[in-house]
């Protein structure tokens, strides 16, 4: 099994010290099964070698991708990463690979599916909760309510869960082919999944990798790994059939 971790350059430089890396290892992955990737890898990246993709947090998605101009000074974009990840997502979807999105990853997935974002929550809305917490990243600050009992998220949690909150943007208009599976108490989208038949596409607005010591948050990564191992088994089966032929 091999999983691509699409991260910011500074996160990639952390290697095995990255919280994403550590969370997946804690959930049962081996370090050899994980490969951090970023835009400079685009020329040689072969998705045939992977069984799942995690889209991590980081910079804001360029508003041009959802038909808007940048309106606020605190919107910090990385166009190269946007282009790289949208192509990576497109190819992963074509191959029906398991996909996990976290924070920016959730927003990027929504935009790729035709949705839009609040460019800055404090400017575009009047949130009742603090969505960019000042405390430790490993602290939970508010609850999210699960909205779809048939979702993978609902099968992982029971009714609601407490999360950290480290974002100044959020989903505004939902992308086509996605469904909301959780929202915050003030109505913001906190999680989405594929609305149609797809092996596994889950994206959450919070940062579960910073909460991986909590059993319920670790289950998100365990579920993702399970789906990746299933994809790996299918790939091995196809390879075996090809050799027999």
How would you describe each model-predicted region?
Residues 202-205:
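Active-site-proximal beta-strand elements of phosphoester/diester hydrolases
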Residues 103:
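Conserved G/P- and acidic residue-centered "switch" motifs that form tight phosphate/ATP-binding loops
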């Amino acid at each position: 099994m091999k999983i691509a971790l699409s991260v910011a350059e500074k996160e990639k430089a952390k290697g095995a010290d990255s919280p994403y890396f550590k969370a997946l290892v804690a959930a049962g992955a081996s370090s050899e099964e994980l490969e951090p990737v970023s835009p400079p890898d685009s020329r040689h990246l072969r998705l045939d070698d992977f069984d799942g993709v995690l889209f991590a947090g980081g910079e804001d998605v360029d508003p041009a991708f959802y038909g808007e101009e940048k309106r606020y000074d605190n919107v910090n974009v990385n166009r190269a990463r946007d282009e790289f990840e949208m192509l990576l997502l497109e190819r992963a979807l074509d191959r029906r690979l398991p996909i996990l999105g976290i924070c920016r990853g959730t927003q990027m997935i929504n935009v790729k599916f035709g949705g839009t974002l609040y460019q800055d929550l404090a400017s575009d809305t009047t949130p009742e909760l603090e969505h960019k917490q000042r405390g430790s990243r490993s602290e939970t600050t508010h609850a999210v309510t699960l909205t779809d009992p048939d979702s993978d998220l609902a099968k992982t949690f029971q009714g609601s869960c407490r999360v950290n909150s480290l974002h100044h943007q959020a989903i505004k208009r939902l992308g086509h082919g996605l469904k909301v599976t959780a929202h915050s108490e003030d109505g913001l989208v906190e999680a989405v999944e594929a609305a149609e038949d797809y092996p596994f596409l889950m994206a959450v607005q919070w940062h579960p990798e910073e909460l991986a010591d909590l059993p319920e948050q670790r289950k998100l990564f365990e579920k993702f790994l399970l789906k990746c191992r299933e994809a790996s088994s299918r790939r091995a089966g196809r390879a075996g059939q090809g050799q027999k032929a």
